[in-house]
Amino acid sequence: MKRICSIYRSPKRNEMYLYVLKSDVLKRVPPELMVAFGKPVHAFDLVLSPERALSREDINVVLENLDSQGYHLQMPPAEDDYIEHLPEELLRRNDPM
């Protein structure tokens, strides 16, 4: 089952994306979610199929959500996923002796 999907990014939260069927635009997205998401900014369109891999989402979950509720919300990664951890000597550089 192939789906043509429009992907929107949130102006409120970095790396938050909303996947919707291109034919539905944003009609099936609940108003409460739209308020929390902010005014959607179109990022790109994509053809989704079970064979296609997505970098941070399970394609089968995305397709199921598109079919059942009309949208899929991709949340930003957990903080630990994108924070660079500094070496111990840099962390202690300004510590008092």
Swiss-Prot record:
Domain YcgL: 3-87
InterPro entries in the record: YcgL-like_sf (IPR038068), YcgL_dom (IPR027354)
Pfam families: YcgL
Name the UniProt record assigns to this protein: YcgL domain-containing protein Psyr_1564
